[in-house]
Amino acid sequence: MMEQAAFTLRGRNPDVLTCIANLSNDEVFTPPEFANRMLDTLAAAWAKDNVGANLWADKSVKFLDPCTKSGVFLREIASRLTQGLAVEIPDLQERVDHILTKQVFGIGITHLTSLLARRSLYCSKHANGKHSIAKGFASEAGNIWFERMEHTWLDGKCAFCGASQKTLDRGEELETHAYAFIHTDDIRARIAELFGGNMQFDVIIGNPPYQLDDGGYRSGVWVGCLVGWCRAVARHSTVCIDGVPSAATWRPLPWPCPKSCSAVGGLMR
């Protein structure tokens, strides 16, 4: 007979997103604790700007993470909405379907992270799979979009994000790390392509992959583009965090900030 070890993990149920190692220099996962701090700040700012309204009890608010990796922001948003909408939508399955199909959206940064984000949000890498908690999707992607994008090379760098051609022009077998949200001249058309219709968002929140190796090109060009596009697809009457309409983003202190994102101090430790 086997004897029970002196130590035990019985009763411990760790959050799997605290246990996953980072994958690459732009796939550094946001800790759930930090994501929740950002969401707390967001909810407080929303209440201040909307006469004390509870963000998590509003079934009309739409959220977007334009650079989702582990899906932690989307998962925690969905969890808060599930609690906040319990009175207005008492049936749990109806409530979950409403939140996941009409309120929470993401854009994966790589194929692998898009699957991980779907697993975090839908409990299945296939949004329409038999194990998915959402029952209203016809596609495997659900509301977390990913398709391979290509950089537009100009003088050795990407015209949109500044990434180094020497570093990332490496063939079809490897990820390009070209993010759909910023590799476009028309963000409204891109959002319509991804999610359909005249889609706009009330909250755009995420942790951009500032660690991406861009061959020494640390001017923050793509961050400025990200912030500009956030403004373009956000509703006008929405929360502002550190001067960025509807966008809760953060950047590390060493980054210089171009004129287009001069207000984006972000939420930092």
Residue spans for each PLM region:
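SAM-dependent methyltransferase catalytic region
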Residues: 2-269
